[in-house]
């Protein structure tokens, strides 16, 4: 989404919540997602004019988020064990507890995917980006994006073999 932005403050005010949600989904942890966004925004602020001049601050910051997450994972102590992440809160559907439970179970499965596959799934199905945009963010070819997506969906189908649900297709 290309947004006409005048100032850094205006951008953060309008797009900040979406960046936090994206980081939360990529990292699988709300607090880590918030930390990633703070880090990315603090690094983006001094070069904001150049970022806006590039024409797509959303794409630039998405890539910064992905790169920051990958760097964090590399630096993380090998003794830490992922706990499966926080629940992704539902915006509504209080009457549909089964649907909410299904969504929570799916996010727990997505959090078990390897980082590149999880990032690809989030960018494809949450951010609704095409292969070329995802490839630009991940600095790889569109074919690699399709491979990550296919492997992630295959893994999710194996981990959650419910043929009655066609949410993955």
Please provide the spans of the model-predicted regions.
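Short, small-hydrophobic-rich alpha-helical interface motif
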Residues: 19, 23, 33-44, 61-64, ...
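A short, charge-rich alpha-helical start-of-domain segment used by transcription regulators
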Residues: 1-21, 31-34, 45
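Sigma70-family region 2
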Residues: 2, 39-56, 75-77, 159
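Arg/Lys-rich amphipathic alpha helix in sigma70-family domain 2
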Residues: 46-53, 63-84, 93, 98-99
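DNA-recognition helix of helix-turn-helix
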Residues: 70, 138-162
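Short helix-coil-helix linker/hinge
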Residues: 100, 110-118
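A short pre-motif secondary-structure segment
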Residues: 120-124
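Short amphipathic alpha-helical boundary/capping segments
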Residues: 10, 105-113
